[in-house]
Amino acid sequence: MTSSNRYTASEILTVLSARALENGQLVFAGIGIPLLAATLAQRLGRPGLTILFEGGVIGAFVEPGKLPPSTNDQRCTKRANMVLGSADVLLLLQRGYVDIGFMGGAQIDQYGNLNSSFIGDPDAPKVRLPGSGGGNDISSLTNMIVAMKHEKRRFVEQVDFITSPGYLRGQNSRTDAGLPAGGVFRVITELAVFGFDAETRRIKVLSLNPGVTAEEVQDNTGFPLTFDDGVTVTEPPTNEELETLRMLDPERLFTA
Amino acid sequence: MTSSNRYTASEILTVLSARALENGQLVFAGIGIPLLAATLAQRLGRPGLTILFEGGVIGAFVEPGKLPPSTNDQRCTKRANMVLGSADVLLLLQRGYVDIGFMGGAQIDQYGNLNSSFIGDPDAPKVRLPGSGGGNDISSLTNMIVAMKHEKRRFVEQVDFITSPGYLRGQNSRTDAGLPAGGVFRVITELAVFGFDAETRRIKVLSLNPGVTAEEVQDNTGFPLTFDDGVTVTEPPTNEELETLRMLDPERLFTA
Amino acid sequence: MPSSDVQSYATLREDLAKRDRSLREKVVSLEEAAGLVRDGMQVGIGGSTMSRTPMALIWELIRQGRKQLSCSRCIVSTDGDLLFGGGVADEIVTSWFAQGILWGLSKVMRHHVEAGDKRYQEWSHLAMGMRFRAGGMGVPFLPIRSMLGSDLMPLRPEAKEFDCPFTGEKLLLVPALNPDVAIIHVQRCDAYGNAQIDGLQFMDIDLALAANSVILTTERIVSNDQIRRMPDHTKIPFMCVDAVVEVPYGAAPHECYGLYEPMMKHMEAYVAQVNADPVEGMKAYLDRFVYGPKNWTEFLSLIGMEEIVEASRQGRSMYND
Amino acid sequence: MPSSDVQSYATLREDLAKRDRSLREKVVSLEEAAGLVRDGMQVGIGGSTMSRTPMALIWELIRQGRKQLSCSRCIVSTDGDLLFGGGVADEIVTSWFAQGILWGLSKVMRHHVEAGDKRYQEWSHLAMGMRFRAGGMGVPFLPIRSMLGSDLMPLRPEAKEFDCPFTGEKLLLVPALNPDVAIIHVQRCDAYGNAQIDGLQFMDIDLALAANSVILTTERIVSNDQIRRMPDHTKIPFMCVDAVVEVPYGAAPHECYGLYEPMMKHMEAYVAQVNADPVEGMKAYLDRFVYGPKNWTEFLSLIGMEEIVEASRQGRSMYND
């Protein structure tokens, strides 16, 4: 509790994300917060957490202070159990070997669809974003956690372009489209933690981050939010969590 | 010429087969005579002949006196350029990287179709033979040489079962079946060397082995043979060819 | 389920979700490992012909009286004889089944298949590979350009001829094969199942990914630290693996790349005996070499020190310059 | 041919039959190798993001003024900037195109794509992999289970939605990609082109098999004897390869596994300069670092000894225990 004023938005995002991962799980982590959070979880008493990276890595232990600049760099392979082709590591998702896909997001909508391709009309975009990478594959093939900054322009009713499918148009539309497995089940921001309604597949607030009000979350969201019946308040980051995190990312590469 | 009485049927078969291979070619060789003949060709001034084996080998140099008992044994990999998966080496044929497939045969017909699956009715066979192995793939995907013993029961008008396709029912039937590439272009026996008519795709005698008459070849064949207009007589094995061969297979594993 | 049916994606995913894929130690005895293979299962077998055959595990399955297995392997040799003759397999799915070029046809296979009490389901070698690969990729089929036009195609209606929507060409779609269990012998792995395979890998990587459980027998169990020093040498990742058994000479009398070649005197005596009489010869072989020994090491001592040493000398000579 | 058209099998086979695939020495200069890439070709690029990018060859293509290339790569970073900004590529086919997580969007890509003078054709990462793999296998497509339902699917009508004849499930068939030429950087290969790749291999093996010609740049040319001592370490076989160029630090300022990490000061200065002005900043970069140096070694000396040594120290530390 005493540390509540002493962490950045990126830091609480990372800590809460790390908490969502369990020892023994196989987690396919994207670059940035997901990589850092999964590494943090390993260091916080979950050494049996296996991290997979898109570059073609199974079971890496990233070294403190040596965060890789992408998931395709050699630093991702340090003390890994296996290095393999990048299509082959994605096929592990398709086959079903991976428990959790864990990605950042640029823009998300009420059904958990992610856009990382276009702002505006795809034929004449206002902004051409980087694109899918493995994002489409991960979200199509695996149960997924998204960690992202909470801003009104990022939390929209409907994304301009579905790069990575959440529940598409809700209900059974994801399964009907040919995606019977996986789906986003958690969205973690610096304000709150979200889940999805089992039937409508619409996003809902599960818990508020320490010191954050429901109103504040709604104000930063571009559509009317649903709050779970039993909305809780998340425990603030502990000193151990923050210290370990700062040891891992001393230059604040991902937690600026 | 002086050596004409001093070689076995297997030996002339191997020597003539080796002669059919050129330096620089990529040859996918089956076990037995093909492996031995390709190795002989390497030793007779064609060191740039690359031998591929079904076990997953590119560019092996089999050692004298250490002939492998199959193309899936470690002896096949000695001083190879590459070892890879056995499906992957077959995919090289499908992609088109290999010049020549080179196999033995149990039974062949007038269109070069090979049977290594069943004698008699496949539903209640008189003899269940070993089956295709890579034979079907090699003959479907590559220009092929077949080396085999010449017996009436092995050279038949129509095989009981097409395990490995030659020209199927002749003319364009092979291409029409979905096999536009490759096809058997030489059959080598201890009696003669055969090619195929460019149009009918029926087998024909190109040359007679030394001391063999046309009648003798016909007598040992289960259907009426066509003889090429310019049928020649093959040069007998030289002392160098025979000596090198016997150095490679001192125990007469494949040349008994 | 018939061995040629393609599993639905929902079934595949559910079965895999149930497995404990976490990083955990999995070392068990040969007897316990064989217990994971149950009557009637589809069993994928690693290695090829006489190479890296998981012989110790097959030997133990016969000893435990396993029944009605459907076994698949890229190429089958005397292991197939034992699976049929030892009573454990009713069906073998493969591309080639004989004792080897040195000995010709398998009289044991002929005896059982021609009499109709056992089945040999034949595919081309590439088709076997693409069936395992499809299974490992989590797709129901892969396209190939062989088997077309031959009599193998009508023999295998489980594969489907198909007009390519891109090029109009004819292709054959071969169905995924996802065995219930795969048994694979490797040179070394760690206690979690991270396996290194030296030399010929055959179809073992695809098979390990395709199967719904995997048993590794290994010449040697090494530390996880050793694996992590060369992660690009790992060929099978731990999360595919359900059990690890250390069995030195676990492929005997077949070979294990870089360690030992086949034990040819034992093989020759075996072939002479079963080809002379595929029923009584096999029974005598099983009595003496499978049911007789107390354990695998005693089986090795029946092969004899001279053969083991000679096979090892030959095997290690692969690395002579 | 449009970059998304699938080549017929007849064309693929004819093109491959014309190549000299024999075991022969293929060592050429960087200048000669770049000459094998002709205007308008489809060029597949090895490595990924900032790893094992064949930077020296890309640098030489810009110097030689190559034009209208369609370049494909699994993931594109500053190499894509240079291909667009240097005027050599009109189209980039990939799954992700940015400067890297540290710097965010590529202003150079945005400038050209949003203005419409260059095209970024987007696929999912797995789709890129399966496109190269289909190309390498000699089949016109492979089935995948992603891209379905998303807006990427209608964006890419080159892929075909498909009802599986085995299971009735929806699948996406992605078309084979067989580039005219692949450019791949490796740690070592022999004069024939037998290549060893350490660590991350990305999609390079599939790409090498798929392409209709392959240029390898390599940190080091080793003897064929050395290759033949460990044939299971060869990742790309010689018959795929048409030219071999020895270029130490040939991926600079990107990384090469086990040898050097990215040269971050150079990268940061580059990014700051081109993001401030994607046209003039790029022009200034090209003038100084691409057109300016006499040769690749002079480019390295512009990066500076301190950066090269530090990147090498970091790169080699991968093998520290």
What are these model-predicted stretches?
Chain C
Residues 1-321:
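Conserved alpha/beta enzyme-core scaffold
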